[in-house]
């Protein structure tokens, strides 16, 4: 509604983020209202869902939201852990498979050079978050694109936690 007041057709994904999945003050309340938001115009998928600290609660809400995505025929944006990334990527893939969700409708985000091989093997989309000091930087991303091409790759930047630069994508294009 707010974006439309300024002539902007806003698109987004909606979810209980894994960072909040462990917070009993909000997790069930968010899950209770989430289905009604998934019906709204402009909601293109469910996400970010996934794992952060790789807890049983995160797994519970991850699989519950995968089921919602199936019910609403929506693609899924998956947050993968920043720590113990390879293990977390594999656990996300295992949970997705266990739910029977189509891999081609999954974007596994926050990837790196180590995870691109995994996503290529299973048929997911691979997301890369470009940050100035953490996650992927411009030069590492250029190397990934040179080696693997751009097929099934999504690159994003952010202005969220800590030091970030929302203009990293134009900087990547110039590199």
Question: Where would I find each of the regions flagged by the language model?
Answer:
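Mid-to-C-terminal alpha-helical segments outside catalytic/metal-binding sites
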Residues: 170-175
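Short, acidic/turn-prone active-site loops that include or flank metal/cofactor-
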Residues: 130-135, 159-160
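Short hydrophobic/aromatic-enriched beta-strand-loop microsegments
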Residues: 104-105, 125-132
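Mid-domain alpha/beta scaffold segments of enzyme catalytic cores
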Residues: 1-73, 78-95, 110-114, 121, ...
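Short, charged, surface-exposed secondary-structure boundary motifs
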Residues: 23, 135-142, 164-165
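Short acidic active-site motifs
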Residues: 114-115, 140
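Short acidic/histidine-rich active-site segments
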Residues: 148-166
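Short helix-capping segments at alpha-helix termini
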Residues: 4-8, 98-102, 148-149
């Amino acid at each position: 509604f707010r974006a439309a007041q300024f002539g902007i057709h806003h698109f987004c994904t909606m979810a209980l983020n894994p960072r909040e999945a462990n917070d009993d003050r909000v997790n069930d309340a968010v899950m209770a209202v989430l289905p009604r938001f998934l019906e709204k115009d402009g909601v293109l998928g469910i996400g970010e869902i996934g794992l952060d600290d790789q807890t049983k609660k995160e797994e519970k809400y991850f699989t519950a939201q995968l089921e919602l995505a199936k019910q609403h025929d929506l693609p899924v944006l998956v947050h993968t852990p920043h720590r113990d990334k390879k293990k977390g990527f594999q656990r996300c893939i295992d949970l997705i498979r266990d739910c029977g969700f189509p891999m081609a409708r999954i974007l596994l985000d926050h990837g790196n050079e180590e995870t691109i091989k995994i996503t290529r093997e299973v048929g997911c989309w691979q997301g890369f978050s470009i940050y100035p000091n953490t996650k992927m930087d411009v030069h590492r991303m250029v190397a990934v694109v040179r080696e693997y091409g751009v097929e099934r790759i999504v690159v994003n930047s952010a202005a969220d936690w800590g030091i970030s630069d929302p203009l990293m994508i134009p900087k990547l294009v110039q590199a």
